[in-house]
Amino acid sequence: MAYRFIKWFEELSKNDVPLVGGKGANLGEMTNAGIPVPPGFCVTAEAYKYFVENVKVSKEDVKRILGEKVNKGTISEVLAQAPDEPRPLQDWIMDIISKTDVDDSKMLQENTEAIRTLIKSLDMPSEIAEEIKQAYKELSQRFGQEEVYVAVRSSATAEDLPEASFAGQQETYLDVLGADDVIDKVKRCWASLWTARATFYRAKQGFDHSKVYLSAVVQKMVNSEKSGVMFTANPVTNNRNEIMINASWGLGEAVVSGAVTPDEYIVEKGTWKIKEKVIAKKEVMVIRNPETGRGTVMVKVAEYLGPEWVEKQVLTDEQIIEVAKMGQKIEDHYGWPQDIEWAYDKDDGKLYIVQSRPITTLKEEATAEEAEEVEEAEVILKGLGASPGIGAGRVVVIFDASEIDKVKEGDILVTTMTNPDMVPAMKRAAAIVTDEGGRTSHAAIVSRELGIPCVVGTKEATKKLKTGMYVTVDGTRGLVYKGIVKSLVKKKEEAKAEGGQVVVAGAPLVTGTMVKVNVSMPEVAERAAATGADGVGLLRAEHMILSIGQHPIKFIKEGKEEELVEKLAEGIEKVAAAFYPRPVWYRTLDAPTNEFREMPGGEDEPEERNPMLGWRGIRRGLDQPELLRAEFKAIKKVVEKGYNNIGVMLPLVSHPEQIREAKRIAREVGLEPHKDVAWGVMIEVPAAAIIIEDLIKEGIDFVSFGTNDLTQYTLAIDRDNERVAKLYDETHPAVLKLIKHVIKVCKRYGVETSICGQAGSDPKMARILVRLGIDSISANPDAVQLIRQVVAQEERKLMLEAARKQLFEEEEEEELF
């Protein structure tokens, strides 16, 4: 075949993704649309393919390049089995990958590093090198220079592999100077196709490693005086009539990576009125390395530009409007709102567009008629939006679980507050509305997991709404409309036809901090697993046990223990199988007495003034060991089927003796802690946080913060009482100090730390937890992707801050709290 190694932007369009990847194709498309894109060319995917298929590598080459690495592990095995004659680099790569267990992180790191080293160390074929040199020479001549500064970026090309899957995985090199340096950076881009996390992702998604290629974009470097990103639809409010611009000093990497908090400007389309300006404190900026003339460094704004520049508005009002209008032009070309990277070049003062991609998080825009209908619809009730989405139908008001049969498929369930006994009715409902509760209440948690719209804390739903009425529930905004609002229902149906509220992870980022998911019911295991979560940080026992329709102790006393064990085992296995080999942490029963009392056979349950502080969790489990024993028997059944990914998590622990006694009961039924299952505890009681070292010495593998309880116990706030809900704050300094202390001690002893409370689904809390060094965060199914993005961003910030600290030799930073 005739290979095409180089393609100029002018020769490309959006249809050339297979040849130059999404990034390269997009730059070509914009160039030909008259957008001011810095000129450049792409080293095509065919060049990479030619490189790996035509560069012959001998055993001696491998030994010379990899040195001591060839004497151990996979590389040694591959060498021993390889033929003596030189063979294509691709054969070596595929042999190494075929023998790599991607779940063995040490092996994965070592083997992918070996592949990258081979790619970077081998000479570029002369036929490719000469074309790159000639193209670079032509690019330099366009600017009347012998050598021009360029940026070299990777661009993924597999048509069935979204480029988003490579986000943060392949390399970008800025301020590259000279043809030889360009060739080196192209090879480094190619090598980044084989990072551990990119390889892991492809393996887990079932992609064929041999059919994934990489193009490298070589583009004239904008020597940015000011730069940033813009969204041609407001990503916060979903308002398509607004453009949001973020701006900071220097090169755009500081903004894109999250290393700096940029200025934020909101511009109204059409009128070009600047509606809002938030001037940030911009501490750092990225510039061309002044010492080497190559690459970039991060410097302090106060030292490089002057103290007054830290809080100075980056863009003039005229520039804000110029950037906004350019964004509108790009959106008009593509016909969809765009996420755009822009920069002002300090050499010529002109605005340039570096990259543009569609915003994928927007919902379809309502028509003017639909918007008017929503505006005119009568809001009859307001509360807290607890689970997003739209639900419309006939109201059914119930007050206890004995009435759940009244709720039919598609009804709107209205009640004071839901409980586990109502779950069968909740599954049938089109939406749920409650008088009481907050975003951490039972109704909120279960609705989010089921994907059912829910509004909580309305105070008067059961009074204002009558059985037989028709209403439309907006679980996103916390509103209940009178009657059926057709435009909202239409949007819901369109979303459903397109797959509904998508939680499936098309291309999850790989983060150092694991992002897990909370699961209440085995029925949603597949949906939860599809989020791409790294495991289950909380599998609740309550719904499985209470769904038997009878008080579990009465069930056991009637000689039905084996039936209970089977039902539990069936549910646990369903989740363990959906996530295997990812870990699944099962929390033993933690239902308060009021939930037991409402069940058939629960008439002997004690009346407690505050059940949340009463007979529940492990304290009840040890008082009624027959129930805990049944749970352990169920887990043993699942383990015996080969599921070695289960952990046991004890709730409401406050003393080491509770751990010791629970282990004794587990061993009685043949379940061996630390061997058959991982063993851990919930940190929900301040006492557990304070004596964490004693709990660790009793023998635990992991802990998980139950912040819903930890917060209410620390602050003396009933989380389901809407009168004090405004005081409920998981980020209260006292709560955070307890969490920080536990993480610090657990790190010292090698005990894994996680969180499974509602706070794990809060981006603000996730950022704090990453900085505190937590090992994993377990979120609700609908929040997994958001939390993973937040975690990835915060981890990048930490790495950049560490680099800056080393660069500036700063004093040790203040503690977060």
UniProtKB/Swiss-Prot annotation:
Mg(2+) binds at E684, D709. GO terms for molecular function: ATP binding; metal ion binding; pyruvate, water dikinase activity. Pfam families: PEP-utilizers, PEP-utilizers_C, PPDK_N. Its EC number is 2.7.9.2. One of its GO terms (biological process) is gluconeogenesis. The N-terminal domain contains the ATP/Pi binding site, the central domain the pyrophosphate/phosphate carrier histidine, and the C-terminal domain the pyruvate binding site. This is Phosphoenolpyruvate synthase. It comes from Pyrococcus furiosus (strain ATCC 43587 / DSM 3638 / JCM 8422 / Vc1).
